Swiss-Prot record:
Role summary: Part of a heme-iron acquisition system. Acts by binding heme and delivering it to the membrane proteins MmpL3 and MmpL11. Can use free heme or heme from host hemoglobin.
Record-linked InterPro entries: Hemophore_Rv0203, MHB, MHB_sf
Keyword Cell cycle set for record: no
GO biological process: heme transport
Lineage, uppermost ranks: Bacteria, Bacillati, Actinomycetota, Actinomycetes, Mycobacteriales
Positions of heme binding: Y60, H64, H90
Protein name listed in UniProt: Heme-binding protein Rv0203
Keywords: Disulfide bond, Heme, Iron, Metal-binding, Secreted, Signal
């Protein structure tokens, strides 16, 4: 595995976990359900969903080197309109990639909706860039 790919995966996982932490905190403070059924918003379920999405996206990026390079370059840019424009241009030129990544992130989107977690794609990119900037 290339060092850049491993680093990108670690950053993506760190960002996804950071995005899920507020929801995990809420889930931990929430009262258990009366039925005793597994809580889909419990911290353990949030972590499983985040991990699953991160693994799927990492595998996808490994198998799509051009998209991996674009995403890596975006992580190295300053947070702002330029980085969003770079991604938008890539996705407009490659609608299948946009559709694939949307489908891969759908479990996280569903979790966000179901558990009222404020997670969006742009927030994830911004946090990934912030992590990248903090490590320089």
């Amino acid at each position: 595995m290339k060092t850049g790919t491993a680093t990108t995966r670690r950053r993506l996982l760190a960002v996804l976990i950071a995005l899920a932490l507020p929801g995990a905190a809420v889930a931990l403070l929430a009262e258990p359900s009366a039925t005793g059924a597994s809580d889909p918003c419990a911290a353990s379920e949030v972590a499983r969903t985040v991990g699953s999405v991160a693994k799927s996206m990492g595998d996808y990026l490994d198998s799509h080197p051009e998209t991996n390079q674009v995403m890596t370059a975006v992580l190295q840019q300053q947070v702002g309109p330029g980085s969003v424009a770079s991604l938008k241009a890539h996705f407009e030129a490659n609608p299948k990639v946009a559709s694939d990544l949307h489908a891969l992130s759908q479990p996280l989107t569903d979790l966000s909706t179901r558990c009222s977690l404020p997670i969006s794609g742009l927030q994830a990119i911004g946090l990934m860039q912030a992590v990248q900037g903090a490590r320089r």
